[in-house]
């Protein structure tokens, strides 16, 4: 009886989390991923995005696992996370002054990949928007966990740095293996790596968050990464300060799909 009660409580928690992820997903980010610049999307395109978010929400099975580790910079300049060592000048700057770090893995689950594959086979225009929406949704999920951690550490008088993922700046993608091994991500979160270091499920993230005793002045402190903090100026997805507030623009309108069509049953 107690087991059944706990099962129902978990189902309710998951439904609440899924609603939080959908509700906090940054719609501007979705249009930015789709190549929009400078102009507001049309109503039918906004409706298509909302439709994709709603449908994706029904396939979410979010999982998150992370651990805190002591952190130091060794004499040779390498970063010692206790469970592994790494080299990255941009990450070293991000973690300056930190003596602990929080490493984590997060995923939207295998159901999202299944939905994306299905639409790739039957309706590519919608699949493209689905991909962008799912990418924004995993960021939204990480932001939710980021805020939860910030509150927890804040009660101890500690502050978080912007999260930093392998492949970001000069932090090599090779360190995905170190994250996966140290955190036992296959067991703890259902995340595996391919030989080419891609994560499965595809809408998954690994990252390190610095923990310090002083507030961080870097952009993105409140909830994750910021384009302003990244040195990759030529990134096609880089957020630009252009146009008026609340506007996004487009350079590839057709890629978002056309029309407010009836959703296929799949």
Question: Which positions does each model-derived feature cover?
Answer:
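Residue-level preference for alpha-helix termini and adjacent loops
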Residues: 94, 107, 129-132, 136-137, ...
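Short terminal or interdomain "cap/linker" segment that borders an active site or interface and mediates
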Residues: 108, 156-243, 247-266
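Structural signal for hydrophobic packing residues in well-ordered secondary-structure cores
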Residues: 53-60, 149, 153, 231-234
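Conserved active-site and cofactor/substrate-binding residues in soluble primary-metabolism enzymes
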Residues: 44-47, 51, 136, 140, ...
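Compact, glycine/acidic-enriched structural inserts
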Residues: 125-147
